[in-house]
Amino acid sequence: IRRLKEQSLERYIDLDRRFAELDNARASGNAAGDGAGLTFGGSAPSSTVTDVPLRPMTKPAAADPAEESAYQAAYGYVKSRNFAAAVNAFQEFLGRYPLGAYAPNAHYWLGELYLVVDPAEPELARQNFKLLLDQYPDNAKVPDAMYKLGKVHFLKGNRERSREYLDQVIREYSGHPAAQLSRDFLDENF
């Protein structure tokens, strides 16, 4: 099961890399960039995600070089499969840049990481994915976070809520890869 979780994370890292290449190609004519649509991609310490404002942030502020550098350093731990260090780095990143351009992606990756660290922290994963949906409803990571929320609720034994999220992904993001993952998960588990 652990290896399957790690393989799933590797697929998301690869997908993020491809999205980042597309974003970079699109942004080549826009040096300033607005930060919208960015899709970069032991035991971990527990935390909660309650110190972020509760209002939707559909368009985060543009990233400054220090923020981008801190985000890339944290993401580097994901790529090198040092998941506990990645959790720490993303927590620190969000402490410094809670409303930054990369904040939605940091929450997404914390959600992913809390599912693969040992021991897994599904409630913290749920909190980060839900925060992404609530505060950044237009972010490119929303379909993936919604799919992951379906899986987290399934792991926690809440099949009804799981199905709601998975069906919502299929209904609202039918052309997105997360919709096919949701269909597959429903076929295998319901």
Feature-to-residue mapping (PLM):
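Structural motif corresponding to the intra-repeat A-B loop/turn of tetratricopeptide repeats
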Residues: 80, 117-119, 156
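Acidic, proline-/serine-/threonine-rich low-complexity intrinsically disordered segments
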Residues: 1-80
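Short solvent-exposed coil/turn linkers within tandem alpha-helical repeat scaffolds
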Residues: 96-102, 134-141, 156, 171-180
